[in-house]
Amino acid sequence: MNELTLIIPAKNESQSLPKVIDELKPYNYKIYIVLDKTDAETIEAIKNYDVEIIFQENKGYGDALIEGIKKCKTDLFCIFNADGSFDPKELKEMLNLLNSKN
């Protein structure tokens, strides 16, 4: 079975990011949050979650993705938006489909 890591680039997402993490919690995915020169409120909002936080200084979205990908130790990774625009159920379906093909 393939494991999945989620990479979530974020900047100033104190309102939406905790909700996204809560929605992902039941799926037990490894989660990297890449914070790109974010505000203190975002850091405070997610500091107690079981996620790995990667800090970077204003390098932008592309570099945030690269940093997250470099940290991955699983066969699969997925970029997930911090604003809650993706449904975590779709990730589960995608992973089930991939595993059924192996």
Residue ranges: model-predicted function:
Residues 1-102:
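Structured catalytic core of nucleotide-sugar glycosyltransferases
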